[in-house]
């Protein structure tokens, strides 16, 4: 009796090839990475979140109200002066110092919940001296903060990259990966 031999691949061979293809695809993806602007924007969004968490810890440990002022190309933490109770830049801390982003990056903040600033307040704020400016976000000594949504935008040639940081009133932060917008 003659045995007829089956042709084809065994399950083990198929799984081995699939695993090798997956490893190669992973290696190629990791070596290519994302677009440079996208990576830089992601880095700055994570930096913002880390410094905000540091400011929350500072507020809790020191028992003080801390403010966050968002500008078009950066942010700055503030505290009230003991003398006149006016807001001033938080100094003496490298981590919580003023941050200036590249001109290609823009920040925009939307306050959630109640609106404690009107459009006329913002016009007045723009006309104020830098020393008299007030924060948009308050960080309370219990770690809570004013809820907000911060949008970071990076323009890179024909593509605009977006990252959104969302903060709730309990101080929890989330980084949302937004889709890229073609122009």
Curated annotation (Swiss-Prot):
Stored InterPro entries: N_methyl_site, Pilin-like, T2SS_GspH, T2SS_protein-GspH, TypeII_GspH
Residues carrying N-methylphenylalanine: 9
Transmembrane helix in keyword set: yes
Described function: Component of the type II secretion system required for the energy-dependent secretion of extracellular factors such as proteases and toxins from the periplasm. Part of the pseudopilus tip complex that is critical for the recognition and binding of secretion substrates.
Source organism phylogeny: Bacteria, Pseudomonadati, Pseudomonadota, Gammaproteobacteria, Aeromonadales
Subunit structure: Type II secretion is composed of four main components: the outer membrane complex, the inner membrane complex, the cytoplasmic secretion ATPase and the periplasm-spanning pseudopilus. Interacts with core component ExeG.
One annotated Gene Ontology cellular component of this protein: plasma membrane
Membrane topology, record value: Single-pass membrane protein
Keyword rRNA processing tagged: no
Family annotation (NCBIfam families): IV_pilin_GFxxxE, typeII_sec_gspH
Keywords: Cell inner membrane, Cell membrane, Membrane, Methylation, Protein transport, Transmembrane, Transmembrane helix, Transport
Location within or outside the cell: Cell inner membrane
Transmembrane segment boundaries: 9-28
Family in the record: Belongs to the GSP H family.
GO biological process: protein secretion by the type II secretion system
UniProt protein name: Type II secretion system protein H
Posttranslational mods: Cleaved by prepilin peptidase.
Pfam families attached to this UniProt entry: GspH, N_methyl
């Amino acid at each position: 009796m003659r045995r007829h031999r089956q042709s084809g691949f065994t399950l083990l061979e198929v799984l081995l090839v699939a695993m090798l293809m997956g490893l190669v695809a992973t290696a190629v993806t990791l070596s290519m990475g994302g677009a440079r602007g996208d990576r830089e924007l992601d880095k700055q969004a994570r930096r913002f979140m880390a410094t905000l968490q540091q400011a929350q810890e500072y507020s809790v440990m020191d028992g003080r109200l801390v403010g966050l002022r968002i500008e078009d190309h950066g942010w700055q933490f503030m505290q009230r002066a003991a003398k006149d109770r006016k807001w001033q830049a938080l100094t003496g801390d490298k981590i919580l110092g003023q941050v200036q982003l590249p001109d290609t990056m823009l920040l925009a903040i939307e306050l959630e919940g109640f609106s404690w600033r009107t459009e006329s307040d913002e016009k007045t704020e723009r006309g104020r001296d830098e020393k008299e400016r007030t924060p948009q976000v308050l960080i309370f000594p219990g770690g809570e903060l004013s809820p907000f949504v911060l949008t970071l935008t990076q323009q890179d040639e024909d593509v605009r990259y977006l990252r959104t940081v969302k903060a709730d009133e309990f101080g929890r932060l989330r980084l949302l990966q937004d889709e890229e917008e073609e122009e």
